[in-house]
From Swiss-Prot:
List of catalytic residues: 41 (charge relay system), 44 (charge relay system)
Gene3D superfamilies to which the protein is assigned, alphabetical: Medium-chain alcohol dehydrogenases, catalytic domain (3.90.180.10), NAD(P)-binding Rossmann-like Domain (3.40.50.720)
Protein name as it appears in the record: L-threonine 3-dehydrogenase
GO biological process: L-threonine catabolic process to glycine
Protein source organism: Protochlamydia amoebophila (strain UWE25)
Keywords: Cytoplasm, Metal-binding, NAD, Oxidoreductase, Zinc
Sample GO molecular function, one term: zinc ion binding
Marked site: Important for catalytic activity for the proton relay mechanism but does not participate directly in the coordination of zinc atom: 149
Length: 342
C-alpha cells in the first residue's frame, strides 16, 4: 500500500510502498483511507523544524486528519460494520491515569498523538483503537469528515466560554481561527472580530460570513472597536495564531473579568504582562484537542443546524501529488488542503 513517511531526519516526506497492517488486535479497527487533510502539524514535520526534531520518531507514517471506511475489526469491537464511514479521535489515551479514570480523557496525562507519536493515517490503510473511532451520519460529506479533527479544535476552543450576546476577538485567521469565527456566529455571539496580517486568509474569513476581518498591519483595532460600540473591551478572546502579539493583543483588549481561550502554540519563552491578567481578573484557559467525545457530538449538531464550513476547504490533490499540497500549505494562500486516496 501507499504511505507518506517521514523516512529520515531531514526536510520532506517520502511516498513508500508499505505492507497493509495484517494483525488487527482485539480492540482495534483497520480503516481504509478515503481522504486526509494536511494539518499545520504535518507541515512542521514536513519542514523538519525544531519542534518536529524533538517530538517525532523516525521513520513514521504521519497524518491524523482523515475520513475512511472500516475494513476489518477485532473480536471485541462492537457497534461498527464493514464499510461504515468513519473519522476518529487522534489522541490515543492511556485509560489509566486519574483524568482518564474520572472520564476526562481529553486531559489524559499520557496522550499519544496519531501521526506524530505513533503511526498515522497518511496511508491507504491504518489501525486505530476502536474507542477512538467516530461514525459519521450520511448528511456529512467526505470533505467535512476529513477535517473533523481541526474543526473539533475550533469547537472546543470557541465554546470554552459562554458566547450568547458576547463580543469575541479572535487573533489568527488560519483555518481553525476562521472556523471558530463561524462557530461563534452560530453560537449567538454579538460582534465577532478576527485579526491577521494575511489578506488571503482574511478574505477567506469574509467568504465564511465573518464581516469583521482586520489586517492589523494596516487597520486600527481601537478604531474598529469604537465603530462597533465596544466601549469597555471584548468579553471573550480566542488566541489562534500562536504568535506572541496575538496574546498581547488579547490581554490588552479583553475587558475586566473577561475570558481568553488559547489554542495557538506560542513560543516557550513568550512573555506576558501578568499585571494585566491579575488586575483585570482575566481567566486564561489552555485548549488541546477536543473533549472526548462531547465535542464530537457538538460538531455534528452544529452542522445539522446550518453551520457551513464548506468554503474553508480550498484545495484538493491526489495523494500522488502530495508535494503540491504541502507547497500550497507553505505558501499561506490556502484554507484546508485535502489529499484524495481513492
Amino acid at each position: 500500500m501507499k504511505g507518506l513517511v517521514k523516512k529520515i531526519s531531514a526536510p520532506g516526506l517520502w511516498m513508500e510502498n508499505l505492507p497493509i497492517p495484517s494483525h488487527v488486535k482485539d480492540d482495534e479497527v483497520l480503516i481504509k483511507t478515503i481522504k486526509t487533510s494536511i494539518c499545520g502539524t504535518d507541515v512542521h514535520i514536513y519542514k523538519w523544524d525544531a519542534w518536529a526534531q524533538k517530538n517525532v520518531p523516525v521513520p513514521l507514517v504521519i497524518g491524523h486528519e482523515f475520513i475512511g471506511e472500516i475494513a476489518e475489526f477485532g473480536k471485541n469491537v462492537k457497534g461498527f460494520k464493514i464499510g461504515e464511514r468513519v473519522c476518529g479521535e487522534g489522541h490515543i489515551v492511556c485509560n489509566q491515569c486519574p483524568n482518564c479514570r474520572m472520564g476526562r480523557k481529553h486531559v489524559c496525562m499520557h496522550t499519544k498523538g496519531l501521526g506524530y507519536h505513533i503511526s498515522g493515517c497518511f496511508a491507504e490503510y491504518f489501525v486505530l483503537p476502536a474507542e477512538n473511532v467516530f461514525s459519521l451520519p450520511p448528511s456529512i460529506s467526505d470533505d467535512l469528515g476529513a477535517i473533523f479533527d481541526p474543526y473539533g479544535n475550533a469547537v472546543h476552543t470557541t465554546l470554552a466560554f459562554n458566547l450568547i450576546g458576547e463580543d469575541v476577538l479572535i487573533t489568527g485567521a488560519g483555518p481553525i481561527g476562521i472556523m471558530a469565527a463561524a462557530i461563534a456566529k452560530q453560537a449567538g455571539a454579538r460582534h465577532i472580530v478576527i485579526t491577521d496580517v494575511n489578506d488571503y486568509r482574511l478574505d477567506l474569513a469574509r467568504t465564511m460570513g465573518v464581516s469583521h476581518a482586520i489586517n492589523v498591519n494596516r487597520e486600527s483595532l481601537d478604531n474598529f472597536m469604537q465603530s462597533l460600540g465596544i466601549k469597555y473591551g471584548f468579553t471573550v478572546g480566542l488566541e489562534m495564531s500562536g504568535h506572541p502579539d496575538g496574546l498581547k493583543t488579547l490581554t490588552e483588549k479583553i475587558r475586566h473579568g473577561g475570558n481568553i481561550a488559547l489554542l495557538g502554540i506560542l513560543p516557550p519563552a513568550t512573555s506576558i504582562d501578568w499585571n494585566l491578567v491579575i488586575f483585570k481578573m482575566l481567566t486564561l484557559k489552555g485548549i488541546y484537542g477536543r473533549e472526548i467525545f462531547s465535542t464530537w457530538y457538538q460538531m455534528v449538531h452544529l452542522l445539522e443546524i446550518g453551520l457551513n464550513l464548506a468554503p474553508i476547504i480550498t484545495h484538493h490533490f491526489s495523494v500522488d501529488n502530495f508535494e503540491k499540497g504541502f507547497e500550497v500549505m507553505l505558501s499561506g494562500q490556502s484554507g484546508k488542503v485535502i489529499l484524495d486516496w481513492v
